[in-house]
Amino acid sequence: ELIKILESEKAYDGIMALHELKLLQYIIPELERGVGVEQSRHHVFSVFKHSVESLKHTPNKKWQIKFASLLHDIAKPQTKRMKDCYPSAGSGQVATFYNHDLIGAKVAAKIMSRLKFSKADTDKVVLLIKNHMFYYNVGEVTASSVRRLIRKVGEENLADLIDLRVADRLGSGVPKAKPYKLRHLEYMMEKVRFDAVSVKMLKINGDDLMKLLKIEPGPKIGAILDVLLSEVIEDQELNNREYLEKRSFELNKMDLKQLREQAKEKIEEKKMEDDEEIKKEYYVK
């Protein structure tokens, strides 16, 4: 029945009805503990209100993502601590919720086990909650750091994780759903995912060349691959085994220094062109 509520267009209304009828406390009592729990200064809503508002604004229609939105701050009540503000932030105290993401993932796992959800669904929701606080700074990000994030959460979960961040943001009463940094992350994901301009896209590799040309590992292998790649960039139809093998024999007999320099220029030019196209798609600079 809970899945039916989450799958519906009125999931928010359904959860609020359970809350108002005093039934939610018997299904997910951990969620009720957020009622009246205030957050830090930039949050408009209590923990409970923020949770249901996040559910309401989840852009993804899959019930697992909606459930992750509802439970993503489930551990905030138990992790709340008050500490003095830094002098630059004014006077008084501010609420902190250290490790609420990690603890919340464990709490969510217990909830879903208690409610007899499948292991696959539980793993999905838990992973999203555990990683919903991932750090991303446009000025510091690199392709390798994005690759690490992809390896950590799985490429198949990245779009869902971004949807959870959007739900979290809108559920805080912030009008702009997808800030620049999230659009920039999508751009970097696209860039890393395709990584199109690389010798890896060729239908031949270094091992193939060594066997074919009977040569030892060395810079000549890389030079031949670079030249082949530059030619394939110009004409994708050349990326076939027959042509690449024939052309490799020809290149093996040539002085490749100048050819490789020209190839590198062509490769960099193509990378920049592709990068600009992806940036336009996600409205980033």
Model-derived segments and their meaning:
Residues 139, 148, 173-285:
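Terminal helices and disordered tails flanking the catalytic cores of nucleotide-processing hydrolases
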Residues 33, 37-46, 52-56, 117-177, ...:
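Histidine/acidic-rich helix-loop-helix segments that form or flank divalent-metal centers
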Residues 84-88, 102-103, 120-132, 146, ...:
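Active/binding-pocket-proximal capping segment
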Residues 19, 113, 151, 210-211:
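Short polybasic/polar patches that bind polyanions
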Residues 13, 49, 103, 141-144, ...:
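Charged, alpha-helix-enriched surfaces in structured cytosolic catalytic cores
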Residues 23-24, 133, 215:
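Core structural elements
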Residues 1-70, 74-99, 103-117, 193, ...:
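Glycine- and charge-enriched loop/helix tracts that form the active or gating conduit
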Residues 14-18, 54, 104, 129, ...:
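A residue-level signal for conserved active-site and pocket-lining positions in enzyme catalytic cores
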